[in-house]
Amino acid sequence: HHSSGIATITFCWNKHNGIAFPVDYRGRDAEGELIPGMDAAIIREALREFFETYQGRLTYHSIAFDVYILIYQLFMQHILDTEGLLHGLEVMLRSWDCTKLIAYLATNSCAGNRLDLKSNSHEFSGNYSLGEEIKDVTQIELFRLLEYNLIDGLSTWFVKEKYEPIMIQDNQLQIYEEIFKPAIKDIIQMQLTGMPVNMPRSIEVNNHLTTEQERLLQKILADPII
């Protein structure tokens, strides 16, 4: 997350309409060099303001990845910026759904299931893959990346409409709201800064264990057999 960026982003208001636009990525010039995004900082500030003020519900597919990146890139100044982290968690997790979690609860069985967006929206969006799993989006032509990003957003709406009724019909809504969604906050925080640790208590326990280790070692070394 600290070495990532926000290449492009998409917002869709239903499964047929949306917009995608560049943030940090502007494509490459004729020599193959990255074109600098001169207005990236302005767009980032606008995105942050949008997320802070928007009162509607946002839907993601794999929120544990998307929001994890967005919090670090839009709200944190550095890896130890706890204030920015907590503010970002409050803002980004105010009202949301995750179609990956919904799909899991709607399709989970002993036979297994696939939770990736493309598999679950294939009948709607077809095969829009850009080939192998994307490792570096800056190697993709900007127009193609924007198109790909937009189809992702539209497909997320489709998957929500497809599986949310099934999740509710199967009496999984309470599990979704009371177990899965609360866990996401802890998961994202741990992804950003590691597992929360009570440092004073950790130091206290470490000192106790170190003392006990030394005591037992001396006891072993003092044994005549040794």
Residue ranges and their predicted role:
Residues P165-D170, T193-V197:
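Inter-helical turn/loop segments and adjacent helix faces that build the functional surface
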Residues C12-K15, T193:
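Short strand-coil-strand connectors
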Residues I6, L142-L150, Q172-F180, M199, ...:
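Amphipathic, non-membrane alpha-helical segments in soluble helical-bundle scaffolds
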Residues H1-S4:
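Entry/capping segment at the start of metal-dependent catalytic domains
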Residues I6-A7, N14-Q169, I187:
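Active-site-proximal helix-loop-helix substrate-binding element of RNase H-like nuclease domains
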Residues I175-I226:
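Extended, well-ordered alpha-helical scaffold/bundle regions in very large, multi-domain proteins
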